[in-house]
Curated annotation (Swiss-Prot):
Signal peptide: none annotated. It comes from Methanopyrus kandleri (strain AV19 / DSM 6324 / JCM 9639 / NBRC 100938). This is Large ribosomal subunit protein eL14. HAMAP family: Ribosomal_eL14 (MF_00721). SUPFAM superfamilies: Translation proteins SH3-like domain. Gene3D superfamilies: 2.30.30.30. GO terms for molecular function: RNA binding; structural constituent of ribosome. GO terms for biological process: ribosomal large subunit biogenesis; translation. One of its GO terms (cellular component) is cytosolic large ribosomal subunit.
Length: 94
């Protein structure tokens, strides 16, 4: 069973120009859309609304508040030791 999409969940974008890049869910809009961020200076994914069908959740999750700023997300990634994973960028598809 895949990990649930929730605030703080690290996901991989599966569609669009940012496909294959890691992002973090910072807010839930409704049952179909969430707000994600890279943050942009880490992964290149800017803060935007995204359809959950275009996200693949990973088992990793960071402890952030709903609506957290990019700086707070980056700080949480550093504390969790996941900043290097996020900077790797594009996930190889198979």
């Amino acid at each position: 069973m895949p990990a649930p999409i929730e605030v703080g969940r690290i996901c991989v974008k599966t569609a669009g120009r940012e496909a294959g890049k890691y992002c973090v869910v910072v807010d839930i809009v409704d049952e179909n859309f969430v707000i994600i961020t890279g943050p942009k200076d880490v992964t290149g994914v800017k803060r935007r609304r995204c359809n959950i069908k275009h996200l693949e959740p990973t088992p990793e999750k960071v402890d952030i508040d709903r609506g957290a700023s990019d700086e707070e997300v980056k700080e949480a990634l550093e504390e969790a030791g996941l900043l290097d994973l996020m900077k790797e960028g594009i996930v190889s598809g198979s």
